[in-house]
């Protein structure tokens, strides 16, 4: 069944200013609408490495929802468990400045009950043959609880990322049960109630081993934008994976792509450092385009065997 990805579908509406963005005035630019959502992006990224994931989610019961499912199918994502319901998808509206950074955004979350129903109806068959599980740790709490229940029943590793750290920080008990938790520098500071914003990778690498050991987190990766990522496990092994020098067009989806690479690498036998290398490469391909997913690769390009 491959990697099982659990989470939301969003429709992303993105506006790009052609000159320095000025709030409260009309800024000339372009507006595009694309399929998004953290979990949807992760599922499509994994599929674009020809690894055929299964996606557990919901879409709107309309033509837009049909379009989302058909695109996922074309990319070889297994969609048979997805539900079509009212308010099945969320919406994310974002404005970018001329340098590709988000300057304003609003989001509407979808109804999560359909995903919970999918797990109730098909949980055993979904989890028993999964290679691993990828989930947004800040999704509905009942979904997270059921995910870990089934994952532990069938001895599957769970890899987690976050889109809202203020919710995720209340899920520390679940984060402890993950095989690896991936977040950014600011989110790591929230998790450990500290300020990491001005730390260098070396400074962060020096303190993270104690932080995750005391918190009983098995493995953690903290992304630091252009400075790369710091990775650490509970045995005290730590390292820094450098970032790539690229021209930034749009940073949307870069974190999702990085997480996808880490999840792929760890699921299919790579070390934490090697998995960060896959994530860094995928993130770089997203940042230099307006797309929020990576292009298609063959698994052999990353030393993966199917």
Task: Describe the residue ranges of each PLM region.
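Short, conserved phosphate/pyrophosphate- and ester-handling motifs at nucleotide-, phospho-/glycolipid
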Residues: 46, 184, 255
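Short, basic and Ser/Thr-rich N-terminal targeting/leader segments
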Residues: 49, 87-90, 225
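Ribokinase/PfkB-type carbohydrate-kinase core domain
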Residues: 1-9, 71-84, 96-238, 298
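A general structural signal for well-ordered alpha-helical segments in protein cores
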Residues: 39-43, 65, 90, 144, ...
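Glycine-rich phosphate/adenosyl-contacting loop at the front of the ribokinase-like
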Residues: 1-58, 63-74, 92
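Gly/Ala-rich phosphate-binding loop of Rossmann-like dinucleotide-binding domains
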Residues: 47, 152, 267
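Hydrophobic residues at beta-strand termini and immediately following loops
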Residues: 56, 106, 240-242
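Conserved phosphate-binding/catalytic region of the ribokinase-like
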Residues: 3, 27, 198-306
């Amino acid at each position: 069944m491959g990697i099982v990805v659990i989470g939301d579908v969003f429709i992303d509406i993105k506006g790009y200013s052609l000159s320095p963005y000025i709030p409260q005035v009309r800024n000339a630019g372009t507006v595009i609408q694309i399929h998004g959502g953290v979990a949807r992006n992760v599922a499509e990224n994994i599929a674009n490495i020809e690894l055929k994931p299964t996606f557990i989610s919901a879409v709107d019961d309309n033509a837009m929802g049909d379009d989302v499912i058909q695109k996922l199918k074309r990319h070889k994502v297994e969609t048979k468990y997805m539900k079509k319901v009212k308010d099945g998808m969320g919406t994310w509206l974002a404005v970018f400045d001329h340098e590709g950074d988000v300057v304003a955004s609003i989001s509407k979350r979808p109804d999560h009950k359909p995903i919970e129903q999918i797990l109730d109806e098909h949980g055993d068959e979904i989890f028993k043959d999964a290679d691993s599980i990828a989930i947004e740790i800040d999704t509905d709490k009942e979904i997270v609880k059921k995910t870990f229940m089934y994952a532990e029943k069938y001895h599957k590793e769970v890899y987690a990322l976050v889109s809202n750290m203020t919710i995720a920080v209340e899920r520390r008990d679940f984060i402890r049960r993950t095989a690896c938790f991936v977040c950014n520098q600011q989110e790591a500071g929230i998790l450990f109630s500290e300020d990491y914003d001005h730390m260098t990778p070396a400074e962060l690498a020096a303190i993270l081993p104690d932080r995750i050991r005391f918190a009983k987190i098995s493995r953690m990766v903290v992304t630091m934008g252009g400075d790369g990522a710091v990775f650490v496990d509970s045995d005290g092994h730590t390292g820094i994976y450098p970032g790539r020098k690229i021209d930034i067009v749009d940073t949307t989806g870069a974190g999702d792509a990085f997480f996808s690479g880490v999840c792929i690498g760890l699921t299919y036998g790579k070390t934490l450092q090697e998995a960060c290398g896959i994530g860094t490469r995928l993130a770089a391909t997203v940042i230099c385009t307006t797309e929020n997913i990576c292009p298609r690769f063959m698994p052999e390009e990353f030393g993966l065997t199917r």
